[in-house]
C-alpha cells in the first residue's frame, strides 16, 4: 500500500510504518556524519539521515591530499550513499542527505553568495528569495534534500560570534528574509530547517549560553521569525538550539516543541538537533543521568532526530530501559517518513550528472551572486573621495592581507567552492582587471606603508576580521594581526629573514591616513566594528561584510562609481563595546538611556547607508482603506547617477498601558530610480503591525496612539503621521 502513488504522503507513511520492524524504525531516527579521511567508510547506511559526503572537500588516498569537490564528484558520492541506504534498508527507504547552506551549498563548486548579514543589507525580499531558489536548485541537482538553513536568530549583541549568520537585529527583516529563504528551498523539493530554536546566545553575546528571555520577549521578538517560517515559508523541519531557556534546554523543551511549535503554530514536520545537541543535554546542561536518558527525554518532549551522529543503540537502550515508549518512537518515525514521501524520495531518489552540471554555478547563478554583492555593500562615510575617477586618481596603494583573499568568510555556514572558482576574483585582482589599464594599483607590503602612502593618489585598506561559530568577542575593535611580506600575487613568502610587523590594524589605518588623507577603509567582517580609533582620519568607509565570490568585482566597481551604493545597515553600529547590547527597538527607560559619558546614540544607526546620488521624497501621505494602512508618495532622483533608495516605515506606540519599543520597523521598500526619474511608491502595513501583547499577554489590536515615520534610516525621518486605534478602528 505504501507504494501506491495515488495516496497522500500521510497515508503512505502510515502504511509503511505499519510494516516496519522496531529495528528499522529506530534506524530511521538515526544519523551519521560524512565519511572519514582514513580510507575506511564506517557509516551505517541503514540510518535515515546522512550528512552529505559531497562536503566541500575530499581526500585523495593515493595523493594524500585534499582536492576540491567537483559537481560530478558530488553527484557520484551522493548517488552512492543513497543507493547503499536503499539496498541496506529492508523496505528500500533512502536516507535524507542534508548539508549547510546559509549563503550557498557547502560543497564543491556551488555558487557562493554574500553572508546572511550582507544579504540583509539589501532590504530586498525578492533578491533573498532568488538566492534561496538558486541554492535550492543546486542542492537538489546533486541530491541534497535538506538544508540546515536559514538562521533566523535575532542578533542584538554584536559580540556574538555568529552574528554574520543572521539577518541582523530586526524582527521584520528576520521574518521576511526567513520566509523568503524557506520558500526558495521548499519550492525546489529541499527541506528548509530554520534554526536555532530559540535565542541561541546569552548575556554578553556568549554563544549557546542560558537565555533569560521572558515569555513576552520570546513572543514579541525571538519566536516571530520561526512562526512565520512555519506558517508562511512552509518550513518542514526545525533545528533546536544549544541553550536553555529558564533552565530547560531547548532540545528537550516540551513547551517550545509541542505547545508552541506544533500545537499553536501547526508545524507538522520533524525536529532535528543542532550537532551533538542531544548529547549536550547530558554533558553540557547535566539535566539527565546519561545520553540514553537525554535522547528519550528529548523525544518525549517533541524532538525527533539527533544530528550529526545518533547510534541506534542509544534509542534501543532507551526503549529497553523504559525511558521511551514505542508510541513516542512511532510519532517521530511517522514525521520523518511523511517528508520522505512528500519529497518523492521513495519513488525517484536519484539525480542526473548532466542536469547537475548545467545547474550548479551557471551563468545565471553567478550573475545573481554579483547582483547580491552589489546590493549588500554599504557606504558608511564619504567626504567626497568616492567614487574615484581614473582621471584624477592615477596611482593607488592597496594594503591588507584581505585584499587578495576571496571575501566569502571562513566558517561552516556556506560554500568554499568560491575558493576554487577560476573566474572569482579577490578585490585586488578585480581592481587590476577592471581598472589596471588606467590606474597603477600597487599591493603594499608591510614595510612600505609610509613610502607608498605618500607617493600614491589614494590608499585602500582592507580589514582582516575572522568571525564565526565559537568566536564570540569581548571587544569589537579590529583585531591585532601579523602582516607578512607577500608576493605581488598575494602568496605568502615563508623566508624567515623577511620582516613581520605585529601591528594593530587601527594604528595601521591611522598611519596610512596620516601620509595620505585619501584613504578608503573597506570592512570585511561579519558584525559591527568599533571605528572610534580611526574613523575621523580616513576619507571613506565601505561596509562590505563578506560579500561572496563576486564581492571582489562588486567592491572594485563601487569604488570607481560603476554603480551607486544602496545597502542599508541591518544592525546598529555602536560607538564602543561599553554600549552593548545596543539596538534601535529598545523600550524607553524610566530615567534615560546611556552612560554618563555617552548618550546612548550609535555611531551609525539601523537602516543607515549613503549613496552617490541624491533623492527627494515628495507628496508622501497616509492611506487608510478598509482597515489597511499604506504610506504612499513619490521619490525623485535629483542626483547625477542612477541609484536605489530604501524607504522605511517605523511605528511608535504609546498610551496602551504597556511599555513598547521606541520604534519598530513595520514596512520597507527598495526602489530603483534612474537619474532624473520620478517613481511612485506604496509601502503597505498589515493589520498585525498594530497588534501587541497587553499586560495580560493578550495579543490584539488594543486601543493606542501611534506615530508612523517614513524614513531613510531609523534616525533620519522624512515625515511623521499620527494615527489612533479605538475599538479596533484606525483613525487619523
Give the residues covered by each predicted segment.
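Extracellular and select intracellular beta-sandwich modules with Ser/Thr-enriched
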Residues: 717-721
